[in-house]
Design a protein with these regions (language model features):
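Short coil-to-beta transitions that initiate beta-strands within beta-rich domains
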Residues: 7-24, 54-73
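Short loop/turn segments immediately following the C-termini of beta-strands
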Residues: 24, 34-35, 44, 71, ...
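Conserved beta-propeller blade signature
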Residues: 28-31, 76-81
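Short loop/turn segments that connect beta-strands within beta-propeller blades
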Residues: 43-47, 93-95
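Active-site-adjacent "subsite" loops/lids of carbohydrate-active enzymes
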Residues: 141-158, 231-298, 447-451
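Aromatic-lined carbohydrate-recognition surfaces of secreted/lumenal glycan-active proteins
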Residues: 152, 223-233, 305-312, 331-367, ...
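Catalytic domains of carbohydrate-active enzymes, especially glycoside hydrolases
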Residues: 163-188, 298-303, 377-380, 458-464
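Substrate-binding cleft of secreted/luminal carbohydrate-active enzymes
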Residues: 378-392, 400-409, 414-491
Length: 492
């Protein structure tokens, strides 16, 4: 309980952005939380935590580094704090931390933690301007990709009356973009490709003509985003005797993620392969997908969206050996190498999808999704902040509907903070129900979706994409256009 400020629930914790032992009192450890979530002192003996008034308004600046210094051996210690844009010093009173005094307005509150304590006046030492100017082409791509609001459309819905229904929906809602599968979750190219390799391995299922879909999108004033599922690819996995498949080191064959299904009537159990993963270290796999992206670019698609830029997360992943891994290359380096190469060949904006928690916090040792690194090469990050996919006890003290808004608002802010202006943040909005959400009545699920949208807008996201794998956007029950145009003040 003393470290309540660290706990988010569901086994998740806030990031500690800096830490320093107090030389005047070894019992005290000073630490700050990332994303402007506060400055604290932990008293090891009493196992208590004091919240300290930070050198800037809570939430407006993060303390990135703490250190103790003094001018001479007989002088008193002072605390130095490096925030996002400045250096500050704080002389420490000889008697220790003072009782609460002038603590400012609306400080963060934590269960079992004292209100912020006034320990003296922070003194500004210098302002720091670390922001590096972005290259002109990067600025141009980000501007082209900004403020895009749309829906995901499966390739099976990309022609005829089904496509028309989606176009009518987009127009009625005041939306201006569409994400369309050009290489789907099974590894099939869904258009009339001219590329020899996908044709040779049987990885083409034409569902529309690329020239037609580009013309139709642009005629309707839509920004067309071409989705390419990269490292999850059943067709390339099977091609050429599984030459490029993730490899099972024990079975000495293609690695398989096996799942079970049970027949509700007979109880019969069936085992099947759930996902097919190719080797993210393989340069052939990189080139195969980059060639597809280049073909889309040449055909007039406005943006390339790479999905599944990660390593597998489920199954016996410890049993995988990566046959194309070069000495010294880790998972993050593999993904970075792919994105760096893609950037060389693509002049249009690149976006990539990431797990919601990978946009909420800096993590890279799980599936190697690291948006700080991604943002050096891509122009748009699309975190999937689906509230249903966070553990229920994550922010578990909040009611479900306000929690949905907070996850999107806070997550969008955190993602923007992590990438430091190098990428647009355009979250995927959960437009489907799962688990307990399936019992929501229309007014409830409508509020749920609107809360997500408002969270994105109030978190300063630059657009959003509604996601429903079945392409049924029934959760949208009020026009989104006015909400988007009026921003966060439209509906409360």
């Amino acid at each position: 309980e003393p470290l309540t400020p660290l706990k988010l629930g569901g086994g998740n914790y806030e990031e500690i952005s800096s830490l320093a032992y107090d030389p005047a009192s070894p019992d005290r450890i000073w630490f700050s939380l990332g994303f402007g979530k506060g400055l604290f002192v932990y008293h090891r003996g009493g196992k208590t935590v004091d919240q300290i008034e930070p050198p800037a308004d809570p939430g407006s600046s993060s303390v990135r580094a703490l250190s103790f210094n003094r001018h001479g051996p007989q002088d008193g210690w002072y605390l130095e704090a490096r925030t996002d844009d400045a250096r500050w010093v704080l002389p420490l009173p000889a008697g220790g931390i003072d009782p609460p005094k002038n603590v400012g307005a609306n400080p963060p509150k934590y269960v079992g933690v004292s209100p912020p304590k006034y320990v003296g006046a922070w003194k500004l030492i210098e302002r720091i301007q670390d922001q590096v100017a972005l290259p002109a082409d990067k600025v141009s791509r980000m501007a082209a990709a900004a403020n895009k609001y749309g829906i995901y459309v499966s390739s099976r819905w990309a022609s005829g009356p089904r496509l028309k229904a989606h176009l009518d929906f987009l127009k009625a809602q005041g939306l201006n973009s569409i994400v369309l599968d050009f290489k789907d979750d099974d590894g099939y190219l869904t258009y009339d490709t001219k590329l020899e390799e996908p044709i040779r391995i049987g990885a083409v299922q034409k569902r529309f003509a690329i020239a037609d879909i580009v013309q139709t999108a642009h005629a309707n004033g839509l920004y067309l985003i071409g989705r390419i599922v990269v490292f999850r690819d059943k067709q390339l996995y099977k091609a050429d005797s599984s030459t490029y498949a993730a490899w099972d080191k024990a079975a000495k064959g293609p690695w398989r993620y096996l799942k079970k299904s049970v027949d509700d009537l007979t109880g019969e159990e069936t085992v099947f392969q759930g996902e097919y993963w190719v080797d993210p270290y393989s340069e052939h796999v990189w080139d195969y997908n980059i060639d597809i992206a280049r073909e889309l670019q040449d055909a007039g698609v406005d943006e390339i969206q790479f999905d599944y830029i990660r390593f597998p997360s489920d199954g016996d992943i410890g049993g995988i050996t990566w046959r194309y891994r070069k000495p010294g290359m880790g998972k993050m380096e593999a993904l970075e190498s792919f994105l760096a190469k893609a950037r060389e060949y693509l002049a249009i904006p690149i976006s990539t999808d990431v797990y919601g928690y990978c946009g909420w916090a800096r993590i890279s040792n799980w599936v190697a999704q690291n948006i700080e690194m991604y943002s050096r090469y891509v122009d748009v990050i699309q975190p999937m902040f689906y509230p249903s996919h966070f553990p229920r006890d994550f922010l578990g003290t909040m009611d479900y509907l306000p929690r949905a808004k907070y996850i999107y608002e806070e997550g969008t802010k955190r993602s923007a903070y992590i990438v430091e202006g190098r990428s647009v943040i355009r979250p995927y909005v959960q437009a489907f129900r799962i688990g307990a959400e399936t019992s929501f009545a229309p007014p409830v699920y409508s509020t749920y979706l609107l809360n997500e949208v408002h969270g994105t807008l109030e978190g300063a996201g630059s657009g959003f994409t509604l996601w429903n794998a079945s392409n049924d956007y029934y959760m949208v029950t009020v026009p989104l256009g006015p909400i988007i145009s009026q921003g966060a003040e439209a509906v409360r």
